[in-house]
């Protein structure tokens, strides 16, 4: 029989059932930078809990990271957020850029995303890291970034304004986001050890979702004897907790045994 002669009566109609889908417990939406090489891979581990689903959309950004290029993302946020379908019933949506949040502003990020998803719970790595350190009862932070000085200083000032102490700040001084994604985990680990060993800090924060830091959290904590977190690490934890997922994990560092 030719294709044009096919009719519905020629196809056996079968019954089916539906369930709550992959996100039976939580549906998490993420806005990921187009230049990011790392976030999705690390989130596969950090959000690997039964009934938790992750859906992401990529936001246009420039590979060269400056305050000016970061600020341009504010107008793109509502457009990118609209690519995450309302029908998925998201519990929370995250914006995956620590430096971008610093430049644009946490409240502005939330407002932009809520343009597409009114009333949705929103978080980002900057908000998440502060929530993480409060949950861990860490006030004095050793701070590592890959950024140029102006961005690093702006982020440090934000932490200080929120009541944290930042006795030591260090950076890789790299503004090319492609290169940032290629910085080795061992380079990050050795840097965390170097800055975190000081007695005047209670924990370490590794900023930037493009740095491959999730895998070094546990060895760094074991070496230093104090909490360590990163942009992706704290953001994943915050997304889970805001979505009502309170599961603990024995292999994701101290933070994943904390509630908000």
What are these regions (language model features)?
Residues 2-80, 149-152, 156-184:
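N-terminal glycine-rich anion-binding loop in soluble enzyme alpha/beta folds
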Residues 90-96, 142-144, 201-208:
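Periplasmic-binding protein-like
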């Amino acid at each position: 029989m030719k294709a044009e002669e096919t009719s519905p009566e020629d196809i056996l109609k079968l019954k089916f059932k539906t369930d709550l889908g992959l996100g039976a417990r939580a549906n998490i939406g993420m806005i990921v930078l187009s230049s990011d090489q790392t976030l999705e891979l690390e989130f596969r581990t950090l959000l690997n809990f039964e009934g938790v689903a992750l859906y992401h959309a990529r936001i246009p950004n420039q590979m060269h990271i400056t305050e000016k290029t970061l600020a341009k993302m504010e107008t793109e946020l509502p457009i990118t957020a609209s690519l995450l379908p309302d029908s998925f019933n998201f519990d929370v949506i995250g914006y995956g850029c620590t430096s971008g949040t610093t430049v644009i502003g946490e409240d502005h990020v939330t407002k932009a995303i809520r343009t597409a998803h009114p009333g949705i719970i929103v978080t980002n790595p900057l908000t998440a890291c502060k929530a993480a350190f409060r949950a861990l009862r860490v006030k004095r932070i050793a701070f590592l970034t890959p950024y140029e000085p102006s961005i690093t200083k702006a982020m440090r000032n934000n932490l200080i304004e929120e009541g944290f102490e930042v006795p030591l700040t260090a950076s890789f001084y790299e503004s090319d986001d492609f290169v940032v994604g290629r910085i080795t985990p061992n380079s990050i680990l050795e840097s965390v050890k170097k800055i975190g060993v000081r007695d005047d800090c209670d924990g370490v924060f590794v900023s930037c979702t493009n740095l491959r830091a999730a895998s070094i959290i546990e060895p760094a904590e074991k070496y230093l004897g104090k909490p360590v977190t990163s942009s992706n690490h704290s953001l994943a934890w915050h997304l889970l907790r805001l979505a009502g997922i309170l599961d603990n994990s024995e292999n994701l560092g101290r933070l994943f045994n904390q509630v908000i």
